[in-house]
Amino acid sequence: MTSIEPTHTGKKVIVGMSGGVDSSVSAYLLMQQGYQVEGLFMKNWEEDDNDEYCAAAEDLKDAQAVCDKLGIKLHTVNFAAEYWDNVFEYFLAEYKAGRTPNPDIMCNKEIKFKAFLDFADDILDADYIAMGHYVRRRDNADGTTQMLRGVDNNKDQSYFLYTLSHEQVARSLFPVGELEKHEVREIAKKMGLITHDKKDSTGICFIGERKFTEFLGNYLPAQPGNIETAEGEVIGKHQGLMYHTLGQRKGLGIGGMKNSNDDPWYVVDKDLKRNVLVVGQGGHHPRLMSNGMFVNQLHWVDRKGPVEGSQIVVKTRYRQQDIPCTLTYLDDNTLKVVFDEPVAAVTPGQSAVFYDGDVCLGGGIIDQLIRG
């Protein structure tokens, strides 16, 4: 690994330390570049059982151990109230409305790059903040700053960060975005950081790993109903539409049906008026396919957005292959998007994120699908 010449002596960076390997290596790399680095550990959820408490305590312990190893300060802050008001209530409202939200995107918008940045500015006098996200920033000669996909295609997290403003991107550093994941772990191991082999976190942003059905049921009353085929035959019962999403294959409890072929069953629609879960066989069932979508709540990182008719691509979920598409603006806050080829399992409530090459342009929320 080539050494990095220090070029940023004196600039203060507050790194969001999660207790994971990505933030650990981010702090180390920034120190190598000459920044004055301090860590900040966020507590964003009030744990309500012992397992959660232990996991959160372990993350803080690991973050402290890494900061001790690197010789930097670790601050802590509690954003639980902000998380509840700005992320979790939105999450519940979307599920209640029958949509499938992405809390990680809202969490980045409201907590990691807003509440965190404000705290780093007002309390810790930071020049920049830094996170362990796999994205890159590019500073252009004209003074603009763009957000790019991470070098590691499999770990690229730009989909989750499309709501960042130009100003937020300009104040943020993403050291691991220039690296592959295996390189990050190798650096952590070489530096003797205890997080080098720590498993990547999954689950809902800050709420951690838990049984989703049980967790959601604590906050929203489930409404059981029928499962029907696309042809209208009742073949089972569901415990609540909110527990299911378009394209879902597992957990339907309808295997081994008589008079059906061997193709697996998928959720192809949710009938909110009748509280019916509609299923069909095969991952390309006609009810599962869309020719396009209407997208609203638009946000463009550079404030301008793509030009109508330009050759760009879209992702309608994380780690999806790029989808070539054509855009038409219906108004300042609504897009009509037509796919070059039909796409399966496009889900209202999820985010559509647009790219021009490696540049993440921004996106919006999928509102309605175009079928037929």
Swiss-Prot record:
Site feature Interaction with tRNA, where: 133, 350
GO molecular function terms listed in the Swiss-Prot or TrEMBL record: ATP binding; tRNA binding; tRNA-uridine 2-sulfurtransferase activity
Subcellular localization(s) per the UniProt record: Cytoplasm
Chain residue ranges for the region called Interaction with tRNA: 155-157, 317-318
Cysteine-cysteine disulfides: 107-205
Active site residues per record: 107, 205
Enzyme Commission number(s) of this protein: 2.8.1.13
Region ranges (Interaction with target base in tRNA): 102-104
Pfam families cross-referenced by the UniProt entry: tRNA_Me_trans, tRNA_Me_trans_C, tRNA_Me_trans_M
Keywords: ATP-binding, Cytoplasm, Disulfide bond, Nucleotide-binding, RNA-binding, Transferase, tRNA processing, tRNA-binding
The organism's place on the tree of life at top rank: Bacteria
GO cellular component terms, A-Z: cytoplasm
GO biological process, one term: tRNA wobble position uridine thiolation
Binding residues for ATP: 16-23, 42, 132
Catalytic activity, as annotated: S-sulfanyl-L-cysteinyl-[protein] + uridine(34) in tRNA + AH2 + ATP = 2-thiouridine(34) in tRNA + L-cysteinyl-[protein] + A + AMP + diphosphate + H(+)
Keyword ATP-binding: yes
Keyword Repressor assigned: no
Family: Belongs to the MnmA/TRMU family.
NCBIfam families for the chain: PRK00143.1, trmU
Function according to Swiss-Prot or TrEMBL: Catalyzes the 2-thiolation of uridine at the wobble position (U34) of tRNA, leading to the formation of s(2)U34.
Official protein name in the record: tRNA-specific 2-thiouridylase MnmA
Gene: mnmA
